[in-house]
Amino acid sequence: MKLTQEDHNWLEAYRQTLDQQFPGMVEHILLFGSKARGTATKESDLDLLVVIRRGDWRLKDAMTRPGYLLATASDVVPSIIVLTVEEWELLQKQQTPFWLTVQQDAVVLQ
């Protein structure tokens, strides 16, 4: 894992915000991609998968918004994907390339 102090600060602020605004909704937060693999460059974004217990597209959108707002005050460039547990399990069952990539790279943050 190759995270800057600013990445750590952003992640902690985002996790706290999710806990406060959406209590009990987050099942897992997974870091994946180049930052998780330790191959990040200055131009790399921070790939994050948030798995929630349930919800629709409105809730998913509402859960990504704070992350992007927090990023405006930093140099962190997040790429946030929110899926329900059911959607994540379906990707697992289908062994999709996205699921395989996340499984290979993932660092569990929550």
Located regions from the model:
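Conserved H-loop
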Residues: S34
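Short beta-strand->loop micro-motif that forms the acidic, two-metal-ion catalytic signature
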Residues: D47-V50
